[in-house]
Amino acid sequence: MDVFAPTGNLYAGAIWPEVVVTLTLLLVLVVDLVGGSAARKSLPALSIFGLIGALVTLVLQWQQPQLESFLGSFAADPVSILFRGLVVGTAVLTVMMAERYIAQSGAPTGEFYVLLLTATLGGMFLSGATDLILVFVSLETLGIASYLMAGYTKRDPRSSEAALKYLLIGASSTAIFLYGMSLLYGLSGGQTKLEAIASSMGDAGLAGIIALVLCIGGIGFKLAAVPFHQWTPDVYEGSPTPVVAFLSVGSKAAGFALAVRFLATVFPAMTEEWRAVLSVLAILTMVLGNVVAIAQTRLKRLLAYSSIGQAGFVMIGLVVGTEAGYASLIFYLLVYLVMNLGAFLCITLFSLKTGTDEINEYSGLYQKDPFLTLCLSICLLSLGGLPPLAGFFGKLYLFWAGWQAGAYTLVLVGLVTSVISIYYYVRVVKTIVVKEPQEMSVSVQNYPETNWQAEGMPALRVGMVLTLVATIFAGILSNPLFTLSIQAVEQSPFLGFPTAQAPIPESASLQVAVDGSLGSLTQPSQG
């Protein structure tokens, strides 16, 4: 029996992964309401198993023909599948780091997992939405659940402040985006399907430009792109660390999925205009995010500005708009998931044991916790783009795609800001690995021994090991992952690329020859 067979003309099999997450959400809710304390301890495991089940259905869906469901409102094309997988993978690792965090903070358990699964569901639907109504509902589902999670530890004033700021700025950005969508609805004569809007608008003139700017403003908030980034540092610093981890990858991945589909489908006649606007935003985002990060003294706030800068790097692939550009965007988000969440897993463990995330308090950690030091150092160095880690190949593919497309300014700014980012990442690593006893911080001097048998600690350790291994080996196996991304781009009709195999740079044999301002990359033929 084919579980993805059409149901009437709805093709309901396209949303099987979302159905699995919904059933998991309902099960968690019921167990939390009617179960005892022993049953509630199983909620993290239930959530993880349900999310893994959703990943399995996404893998099965990859092997099925192109599906467009619910009368064209939702697409299960390969690009959608990869972005939905990113959101679900982020949720899995978030549960792993949240179990111990919630147990130690004393906050209600069930509510957090319900909110996390709701946000995951919103992000998954947003990744495949092809209708204005579904786009808005998905965006609000993800947004409202994220606001509530940001203020989850309501007894902490910083968490409440972060949630309020996130809510106010998020509501404003939603209103801007909704106004842009209303203009599109009017200009297209009442169409709600993205493709129908593009074909019905014709020459929209000034009104079309205004709609484009408003939509970019709403999407820019989700990407934390400058100048829509003001919420990021305060929300990252004040929110619970597992929530910050989810927002930094899951919410951002859903935002990029929306940006790729919305801009490529609705505004093909204004491609030059939106690429010009995003080019400026990408440059500002890379520069501000990486420069301001240098001055930060708290690791979560440093990673907030780092995530802004990382969004600027990913925007290069969006601006380029070629097969290699979109594929490098997807590939970078795949490796960003493991290296960024790996860093947050380490921050979670350290903050649970010391109660701080001040960078100076990490001084001398190598002497007390070599495993944590190794994981955090590898993840930070990968974020900086040092070879042979995953982050290096992610940036290499992005810059290669930009250079091939003639986006020389973007690539040069990306290279310079990457060097800047290496400085502040290495500064943290240097602080961690100092060997002089007199340089050890007070928090590290009083650092308790890790009890890996305590509630939530096994899951935290598994998450750290998984992200550490993935960060190392994703660099070595970068070419198969990039090939997967290329295939997804080619097989997604809304991007308009032929299905013929595009040239792919072999990571094992990329040769860089310094020739003037930048080297040229040679690509051997696929054998």
Curated annotation (Swiss-Prot):
<feature type="transmembrane region" description="Helical">
    <location>
        <begin position="11"/>
        <end position="31"/>
    </location>
</feature>
<dbReference type="GO" id="GO:0031676">
    <property type="term" value="C:plasma membrane-derived thylakoid membrane"/>
</dbReference>
<keyword id="KW-1133">Transmembrane helix</keyword>
<protein>
    <recommendedName>
        <fullName>NAD(P)H-quinone oxidoreductase subunit 2</fullName>
        <ecNumber>7.1.1.-</ecNumber>
    </recommendedName>
</protein>
<dbReference type="GO" id="GO:0048038">
    <property type="term" value="F:quinone binding"/>
</dbReference>
<dbReference type="InterPro" id="IPR001750">
    <property type="entry name" value="ND/Mrp_TM"/>
</dbReference>
<dbReference type="GO" id="GO:0042773">
    <property type="term" value="P:ATP synthesis coupled electron transport"/>
</dbReference>
<feature type="transmembrane region" description="Helical">
    <location>
        <begin position="132"/>
        <end position="152"/>
    </location>
</feature>
<dbReference type="InterPro" id="IPR010096">
    <property type="entry name" value="NADH-Q_OxRdtase_suN/2"/>
</dbReference>
<comment type="similarity">
    <text>Belongs to the complex I subunit 2 family.</text>
</comment>
<feature type="transmembrane region" description="Helical">
    <location>
        <begin position="42"/>
        <end position="62"/>
    </location>
</feature>
<keyword id="KW-0618">Plastoquinone</keyword>
<feature type="transmembrane region" description="Helical">
    <location>
        <begin position="462"/>
        <end position="482"/>
    </location>
</feature>
<keyword id="KW-0813">Transport</keyword>
<feature type="transmembrane region" description="Helical">
    <location>
        <begin position="240"/>
        <end position="260"/>
    </location>
</feature>
<feature type="transmembrane region" description="Helical">
    <location>
        <begin position="206"/>
        <end position="226"/>
    </location>
</feature>
<keyword id="KW-0472">Membrane</keyword>
<dbReference type="GO" id="GO:0019684">
    <property type="term" value="P:photosynthesis, light reaction"/>
</dbReference>
<comment type="subunit">
    <text>NDH-1 can be composed of about 15 different subunits; different subcomplexes with different compositions have been identified which probably have different functions.</text>
</comment>
<feature type="transmembrane region" description="Helical">
    <location>
        <begin position="167"/>
        <end position="187"/>
    </location>
</feature>
<keyword id="KW-0521">NADP</keyword>
<feature type="transmembrane region" description="Helical">
    <location>
        <begin position="106"/>
        <end position="126"/>
    </location>
</feature>
<comment type="function">
    <text>NDH-1 shuttles electrons from an unknown electron donor, via FMN and iron-sulfur (Fe-S) centers, to quinones in the respiratory and/or the photosynthetic chain. The immediate electron acceptor for the enzyme in this species is believed to be plastoquinone. Couples the redox reaction to proton translocation, and thus conserves the redox energy in a proton gradient. Cyanobacterial NDH-1 also plays a role in inorganic carbon-concentration.</text>
</comment>
<keyword id="KW-0520">NAD</keyword>
<dbReference type="Pfam" id="PF00361">
    <property type="entry name" value="Proton_antipo_M"/>
</dbReference>
<keyword id="KW-0812">Transmembrane</keyword>
<feature type="transmembrane region" description="Helical">
    <location>
        <begin position="302"/>
        <end position="322"/>
    </location>
</feature>
<keyword id="KW-0793">Thylakoid</keyword>
<keyword id="KW-0874">Quinone</keyword>
<feature type="transmembrane region" description="Helical">
    <location>
        <begin position="396"/>
        <end position="416"/>
    </location>
</feature>
<keyword id="KW-1278">Translocase</keyword>
<feature type="transmembrane region" description="Helical">
    <location>
        <begin position="276"/>
        <end position="296"/>
    </location>
</feature>
<feature type="transmembrane region" description="Helical">
    <location>
        <begin position="330"/>
        <end position="350"/>
    </location>
</feature>
<dbReference type="GO" id="GO:0008137">
    <property type="term" value="F:NADH dehydrogenase (ubiquinone) activity"/>
</dbReference>
<feature type="transmembrane region" description="Helical">
    <location>
        <begin position="78"/>
        <end position="98"/>
    </location>
</feature>
<feature type="transmembrane region" description="Helical">
    <location>
        <begin position="374"/>
        <end position="394"/>
    </location>
</feature>
